[in-house]
Amino acid sequence: SREGLRVLHERCRGVDWEKNTGHMAELRGLEEIGEMGEVYRRANELHLEAEALDDRYGAVVAALHIATSGVAVDRSAEARERLRIALERWSREGFLLQHLYAVRAEIYADLYDGRPDEAWRRVCVAWPEIERAFFLRTPITRIDSRLMRARAALALAADGGKEAETLLRACESEAALLAKER
């Protein structure tokens, strides 16, 4: 809650991870209710604060939210640039949560920019990594992964290429799996 975050900021020291986690949850909640302009505004504030504190984790988390919300507020080029800078500062070992959400933001930028073929290519490249990192075992990352896969498949199928039927089946499969989520 905003009150909990206020207490962490005003009264606690050495709790950067906890503050970042709280901000991440707050921004995700705003994303889920479609308040993307507010996500964009707050994430930019958090990014400036994290940079001033030399807080790499906070800066990367904020940049991921800027990228996702940036697409929704007609700033896909900025979203891609923020992702590039954030990932330059992040570990290249493994496929971490930050990598998943960077791929998600890039896929949504591709879809926004009318490049469903590129979005689907990204899904196909990332999917084995998503599976290996066990992101399909945790509800929120499983739902996010399946949604981005379904959206990319549907967008490319709408282009009507030779793969349209296969892509629609992939989309239907993801939709059926998503329908089982609670």
Label each region the model flagged.
Residues S1-E10:
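Acidic, Ser/Thr-rich, low-complexity intrinsically disordered regions in fungal proteins
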Residues R2-E3, L27-R182:
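Helix-coil-helix junctions within alpha-helical repeat/solenoid scaffolds
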Residues R13-G14, K162:
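Short coil/turn and helix-start
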Residues V15-M24, S145:
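Aromatic-lined, polymer-binding surfaces characteristic
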